[in-house]
Amino acid sequence: MIDKNFKNGCVLVVGGSGGIGSICAKEFAEAGANVAITYCKNKKKATDVASDINPKVKIFQLDNQDPESVERVMNDAAKEFGSINTIVNAAGFDIPQKFINEIDIDLWKSVMDADINGFFNLVKSGLPHLRKSKGSIVFISSAGLFKYPPGDVLSVAPKATIEHVLKGIAKEEGHNGIRANSIALGIIDTGIFHRLREEENTFFDDAWHEAVLNTLALKRFGFPEEVAHTAVFLASSKAGYITGHSLPVDGGYHI
């Protein structure tokens, strides 16, 4: 059944050509939404993802570090579909697993800039569109916010800032009908996790694999479809009274 929140406009999935983003895009399309996805460099992958989902899916190249690029994509997506009803931020990149004392200032600055400023650019350009549609933001975050995993500060620290920005949006923009929520991910069996596991001399060796499984109540890693189902729910009318919330999808890691 098509959710009323998806009847008009589109769902813009930032990072929609990636492992989790592409599955989110597919789930939104199956829920009846018009879908637009963004990519940074790999146009072929984005084109393949779009064609696999639905010929009507539109792709846009986006550099979220460039405010003009973000503004252009927001306006083009809104023009193509009439409006934007949901922004899903599923963009991600391989972040080094380092302990705090191993991180130099240049690496720290580059990660903070990419994650925090990139998200803020999306918010700054997206809010005018979401005010018109009374739409929502869904941010793909980390369960490390609830239970810190040593060596993961470069992932968790910027997301902690973004979580407070989301709460600010929920508080300040609620009267405009805008909702803002996040999904706090545990280990999801796709994308970046696969690449990191395949690297030699990686932090993510077999011992790490077993140790993490032992911390999970459900004793398995998550599937991208489970993340996508949650994203669709949070953006739908069924979650119409939920805002400013971070929903763990982590197999019980945070317990």
What are the language-model segments listed below?
Residues 17-18:
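Conserved glycine-rich cofactor-binding loop
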Residues 92-94, 136-162, 166-175, 187-188, ...:
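Catalytic loop of short-chain dehydrogenase/reductase
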Residues 81-82, 129, 220-249, 254:
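C-terminal substrate-recognition "lid" of short-chain dehydrogenase/reductases
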Residues 90-96, 252:
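Conserved NAD(P)H cofactor-binding loop of Rossmann-fold oxidoreductase domains
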Residues 31-47:
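Conserved glycine-rich Rossmann-like NAD(P)H-binding loop of the short-chain dehydrogenase/reductase
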Residues 174, 179, 242-244:
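Short, small/polar-rich loop/turn modules that mediate ligand/substrate recognition or access, typified
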Residues 98-100, 104-110, 212:
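Substrate-binding pocket helix/loop in short-chain dehydrogenase/reductase
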